[in-house]
Amino acid sequence: MRMPLSVLTAAGLSLATLGLGTAGPASATPTAEGAPVVAYDGSPSAGSPADAKAEAAANRAFFEAVLRSVAEKRAANPKSTAAVTVVYNASGAPSFATQIARGTQIWNSSVSNVRLQAGSSGVDFTYREGNDPRGSYASTDGHGRGYIFLDYRQNQTYDSTRVTAHETGHVLGLPDHYSGPCSELMSGGGPGPSCTNAYPNSAERSRVNQLWANGFAAAMDKALEKSAR
């Protein structure tokens, strides 16, 4: 589904005109090939039972890593009445600062049980950028920490704000649904490059609010048990 770079060049588009770099920061190394990821437009074998199972497991692992990180911080101050806040660090993806900020604004205006906030301490997940044949994806670093990788070329082919908001949806617990319509944010690259919708639909908003009301409560219980030991 990716558009060849030569076609983009012929159309007068380039990494520079799109505000994207040509190489990621040295620290923004993609996850190793074969590591489980939740990709924007699916893996080469998308649609197979094995692939669907692997993606579901990767999405669950990513969400649980973020949830656990947030819950352990909250356990230190369990009586707080403040909204649940998920802290991210976007310093590893400077080329996408605008898209990340926009994606954060979209999600914060769409759901009420959780908030996304930029920060450099108490970070729950990070953004990275670079080139990877798998495109953009959400994954874990092997140490229980989640991150979102934003691929340069894919963000030329597809609407970059939609890609970023979609991947951020995995942070909040939503799985991919490539067969969905453009109005469904988590359909990712399924509807094709012409789809520019970067907003979750009502079902997606409701699911996130439910996950962070119910799922977070369970994660908090585990975090409190751990802190009491």
Swiss-Prot record:
Residues 1-28 form the signal peptide. One of its GO terms (molecular function) is metalloendopeptidase activity. Optimum temperature is 55 degrees Celsius. Keywords: Calcium, Disulfide bond, Hydrolase, Metal-binding, Metalloprotease, Protease, Secreted, Signal, Zinc, Zymogen. It is an enzyme of class 3 (hydrolase). The keyword Transcription regulation does not apply. Optimum pH is 7.0. Binds 1 Ca(2+) ion per subunit. Binds 1 zinc ion per subunit. The keyword tRNA-binding does not apply. Disulfide bonds join 182-195. It catalyses: Hydrolyzes proteins with a preference for Tyr or Phe in the P1' position. Has no action on amino-acid p-nitroanilides. One of its GO terms (cellular component) is extracellular region. Ca(2+) binds at residues 159, 161. Gene3D superfamilies: Collagenase (Catalytic Domain). Its EC number is 3.4.24.77. Zn(2+) binds at residues 166, 170, 176. Belongs to the peptidase M7 family. Monomer. Milk hydrolyzing. This is Extracellular small neutral protease. It comes from Streptomyces sp. (strain C5). The lineage of its organism: Bacteria, Bacillati, Actinomycetota, Actinomycetes, Kitasatosporales.
